[in-house]
A protein has these predicted regions:
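Sec-dependent N-terminal signal peptides
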Residues: 4-13
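Zn2+-dependent metallopeptidase catalytic core
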Residues: 21-202, 208-230, 234-238, 432-437
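Acidic/His/Gly-enriched intrinsically disordered linker/tail segments
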Residues: 185-200, 220-224, 239-301, 305, ...
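Beta/coil-rich, acidic/histidine-enriched accessory regions frequently appended to metallopeptidases
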Residues: 317-498
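Aromatic/hydrophobic beta-strand junction motif of beta-rich domains
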Residues: 419-423, 521-527, 560
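Surface-exposed, proline-anchored Ser/Thr-rich loop/turn motifs
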Residues: 495-526, 538-543, 572, 591-594
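Short, surface-exposed loop/turn motifs with a glycine/proline- and acidic-biased composition
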Residues: 522, 549-583
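Extracellular and select intracellular beta-sandwich modules with Ser/Thr-enriched
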Residues: 584-588
Length: 594
């Protein structure tokens, strides 16, 4: 019999952080020296926001390269030498047949439009159907209020096809706040009927006049680049100052949604899994690989509508100077009765499995067999020759990241492995230890057991390896410290403060969060076997206020909105959460403050 066990330590966090750690001087320098190691759209976002803070000398350098400092938003000028255009739906495509910006004049169908432009036109027609008809996004703000037709000045969204700097596939440039011809309408996307934006922006898009020097099939490059970049224009129609990592992660998600067969997004996965110790929102470059987080959510936990809901929620947060991307994501998930902490933890579990088996349940990646990597990079490997008791003190871990430790249990005489989290829950931090048992060659091959507890004892007599995955969340810091110990035992006799817990009977009720609370509180619990579980909320006098039932295996959560079973809000005070089965009961106190 062969198993693999994976364990996770998880901590919770939602503090807004600085909107960008990349300085405007660094962004400007990348333009000046032609450095392409950062996506051009992110460089333009930083200059658009902070460009007026640059020194006169650097401003002059950028002006010489076509940047306009006359508006509140600093932007590059639109090309002025493209003498042809073709309209398709809401789009207008600008191009030329002469000079360095010329597209190939080949016109096989003799329709008067070059085949290269025809391909782009058809691509955008398909993109528009998915973005606006199927997914119901609001179209980007128009520039019809511009006085100069050469700068747009129509109701069409402008796409310019010309010779870009070496290495750039395409980009979207924010120019001005939507409807900035009036202080009353400034920042409001005129195409959103039921909402009023404050930071929506007019943009234009740039694509190359050819992709001859790029590896890959040109038509596929055009498709994924167009889907990705145009979604930036859509995003800017909600909040142009949203965090770069979130913009890029969801734009990569969108290109995969449009062109799932191309899988250009796979290029970002290897680095993402090679650096699990970096937060999913670490920086904009990390954001490209973080698309897999949203793929996990929409494949397993929620419909594709989540992506739209995120940007609808982004209207509520002014992210100009402060990164509110996590609160935005939390709010969007809550609209689907999903808890950010729970589903993010589930995401880390899924990364530890990387399985396309139906038995993986909500931790499944349907395309995992084609992913270009295996499990995330290991932080450390522990073997039979390691000490019997190992302590890990003051281990640093970035929020929204994970550390993976492998315990090799082959060729050893010890039978039990104890995982003991020494760092306890606090008002600022939450901790979880989750284990995954993968059955390979026993009576239930290709199945998994998933369970959670802060102290776990695992029978490893027939187990090949154990992987600990430590991940972190916290209130007021982007780093966390944790301590734990690992004990190897050759018998079932453990230390006095330990308990041997059969893997099939390990229930847990974790501390509800946040506590105290004033609107909603999330209650996390683990069910390791098929058995009805009753979760009830009582007042301090023992009266049952609300009851929940669950039979779903694994780590689960419910959100209580402070109302009784009749939907009537309860008063402030102390309440008791009780989880019980035929063989298990545990309670937690919670405090409702209004």
């Amino acid at each position: 019999m062969q198993h693999i066990i994976i364990l996770f330590l998880f901590i919770g966090y939602f503090q807004p952080i600085s909107a960008s750690s990349f300085s405007v001087e660094e962004a400007a320098n990348k333009i000046i020296i032609g450095d392409t190691d950062m996506h051009y759209s992110e460089v333009l976002r930083i200059i658009a926001k902070y460009g007026h803070q640059l020194s006169p000398d650097i401003k002059a350098e950028l002006q010489a390269r076509g940047f306009d400092f006359s508006r509140q938003i600093v932007s590059s000028y639109r090309p002025q030498n493209l003498d042809y255009y073709v309209d398709e739906g809401i789009f207008r495509f600008h191009y030329t047949l002469t000079g360095v910006d010329a597209v190939s004049p080949l016109d096989a169908d003799n329709n008067g439009v070059p085949d290269y432009v025809d391909l782009i036109v058809t691509t955008f027609a398909n993109i528009g159907v998915i973005d606006f008809t199927d997914m119901e996004f609001v179209r980007p703000p128009g520039d019809g209020w511009y006085t100069q037709i050469d700068d747009g000045g129509s109701d069409h969204y402008d796409v310019y096809i010309f010779n870009l700097e070496t290495g750039y596939y395409g980009y979207v440039q924010a120019e001005d706040y939507a409807q900035n011809n009036s202080p009353i309408t400034r920042g409001d996307n005129e195409f959103s009927e039921d909402a009023q934006e404050e930071r929506a922006m007019v943009t234009f898009m740039a694509l190359r006049n050819n992709y001859n020097d790029f590896s890959g099939v040109e038509s596929e490059i055009i498709e994924v680049t167009s889907a990705h970049e145009f979604f930036h224009a859509v995003q800017y129609g909600y909040d142009g100052w949203e965090a770069g990592w979130l913009l890029e992660a969801t734009a990569v998600w969108m290109e995969e949604h449009h062109y799932d067969n191309i899988n250009d997004c796979y290029q970002f996965l290897q680095e993402f899994f090679n650096e699990p110790y970096l937060a999913i929102n670490y920086d904009v470059n990390r954001g490209y690989g973080a698309y897999i987080y949203f793929s996990y959510l929409t494949d397993n936990r929620v419909s594709n509508d989540l992506i739209r809901r995120i940007f609808e929620r982004s209207r509520e947060y002014n992210s100009y100077d402060v990164d509110y991307s996590i609160p935005t994501l939390m709010a969007a998930l809550n609209d689907y009765n999903l808890d950010f902490e729970t589903v993010t933890h589930d995401f880390f579990i899924a990364n530890g499995m990387l399985s396309n088996s139906d038995s993986a349940g909500i931790y499944q990646y349907s395309e995992s067999s084609t992913f270009p990597m295996d499990l995330p990079t290991l932080e450390q490997t522990i073997t039979a020759s390691s000490d019997t008791t190992m302590y890990y003190y003051n281990q640093m871990l970035e929020t929204f990241s994970a550390l993976y430790y492998l315990v090799d249990t082959q060729d050893s005489t010890w039978n039990n492995l104890v995982i003991d989290l020494l760092t306890q829950d606090s008002d600022n931090m939450r901790y979880y230890v989750t284990s995954i048992v993968e059955h390979k060659n026993d009576s239930t091959p290709n199945t998994f057991d998933v369970l959670t507890a802060q102290t776990q004892t695992i029978d490893v007599s027939s187990v090949d390896s154990v992987i600990f995955v430590i991940s972190a969340f916290g209130y007021d810091t982007i780093n966390s410290e944790f301590s734990m110990r690992i004990i190897k035992n050759s018998s079932v006799e453990l230390a006095s403060d330990m308990e041997l817990i059969p893997i099939s009977n390990q229930y847990s009720l974790n501390n509800p969060y946040p506590n105290p609370f004033n609107a909603h509180i999330t209650i996390h619990y683990t069910i390791p076997m098929n058995q009805p579980v009753d979760i009830a909320i009582y007042d301090i006098l023992g009266n049952k206020i609300r009851r929940f039932q669950s039979e779903q295996l694994g780590m689960q959560s419910i959100i209580w909105n402070g109302k009784d079973q009749y939907g009537i809000p309860v008063s402030s005070g102390m309440y008791i959460v009780n989880m019980s089965t035929d063989s298990f009961t545990q309670s937690r106190r919670i405090l409702l403050l209004k």
